[in-house]
Amino acid sequence: MTDAKRAQALDLSLANKVADMALADFGHKEMQLSEREVPGLMELIRMYGVSKPLKGLRVTGSLHMTIQTAMLIKTLYELGADIRWASCNIFSTQDHAAAAIADSGMAKVFAWKGETLEDYWWCTEMALTWPDGSGPDLLVDDGGDATLMIHKGVEVENNPELLKQAYDNKEFQIIMDRLALAYQNDPGRWQRVAARVRGVSEETTTGVHRLYQLEQEGKLLFPAINVNDSVTKSKFDNLYGCRESLADGIKRATDVMVAGKVVVVAGYGDVGKGCAQSMRGFGARVLVTEIDPICALQAAMEGYEVTTMEKAVEEGDIFVTATGNYKVITGEHMEAMKDEAIVCNIGHFDNEIDMHYLETTPGCTCLNIKPQVDKWTLKSGRSIIVLAEGRLVNLGCATGHPSFVMSNSFTNQTLAQIELATNPDLERKVYILPKKLDEQVARLHLARLGVTLTTLTKEQADYIGVPVDGPYKPGHYRY
């Protein structure tokens, strides 16, 4: 049964809630260090810092509270936004980054590394709630949890019978308990919040899937911009970011030698491609599992062996899930793995690996080695090493993607926020940013890498039918 008494009350007198404000100086220094590596964001501050297109608008962020995100927050603040922020993962916050932003006054921050699920959803609701009890004008979302809370809140207000049910999923029950408390205090609150929201910009593949589902069902409550499918996000953050941060997470957690090992990568989308390249670069033999024949063919033609998880478990030393799907690695798979195989996930949510099996099956026991590194003894008598409790390994066990590649993503996020703020004609649909802006984001990052572009002549541009200054490719071009 859903129970409002289980939910912690909001405390709107709190300016921030972070782990340790004494870490602020360290955070400020890291932010200064990253400025040179975020040229896109710095250029947007120069371009829009005077006109301040976000002036007077309230922005809620639900996105990993890292140093890179601190630079995004700084950019939104310089463009005039009034900001409240929570992380989108219980392990991804860098506490010095959260402290630095709280200390700067650029945003109200509710995030710390190692939150419980109850903490997490309390933080999300705190980020969605201003001191007067009202909500945001704009959302910056990663994984769709802020969007989910608003939509579920409206659904509950329209059908309070939902609060009389009990839910098997622990996290969803926590959400419903929070919504029960909100409904008890103000049964029309979430409808007012939704009515105020001008739109959301969504960072990641999983969150975008949620948005398209809402649109297809006619349930999307406000306009949305799909930042993930901007080329300068998905083909850079997802691929090149994961190529570096996956290995960082695995090595910090385990100190394992990757060379010579067999690494199984589940999923060969942009994230999986980056993971496979990373592990091959360290000298591993990489196996890929895929459901999509196109992605499977790509993997095979890059020289990877494409097989099923049922076969791969017999060989794998390290397993990485990168699918955005559910129960990709099951209890049966884990029971068949080698002793002390390493199992981790780089997809957004924690259900790609069946953690529920480990946590509820008699005979499975957990020994914590260090934060975010657990040795699970299985019914088989063998053990596996699970990283970050099945959540994002690169952020749970390391610091996520490097600043430069995140500058690509966050420049897109900022441009999306400007579009949502300034375009009153957007409908309740999912949009993508135009190709011209995608190319602009790339241009802003070329000088840092010493790149000099060739310029088309007018004759050449006319010959291929494009403007001299772009865009150079049609919308359907794959890159």
Curated annotation (Swiss-Prot):
Subcellular location, record wording: Cytoplasm
GO molecular function annotations of the record: adenosylhomocysteinase activity
The reaction(s) this protein catalyses: S-adenosyl-L-homocysteine + H2O = L-homocysteine + adenosine
Pathway listed: Amino-acid biosynthesis; L-homocysteine biosynthesis; L-homocysteine from S-adenosyl-L-homocysteine: step 1/1
Family of this protein: Belongs to the adenosylhomocysteinase family.
NCBIfam families the record matches: ahcY, PRK05476.2-3
Protein name as catalogued: Adenosylhomocysteinase
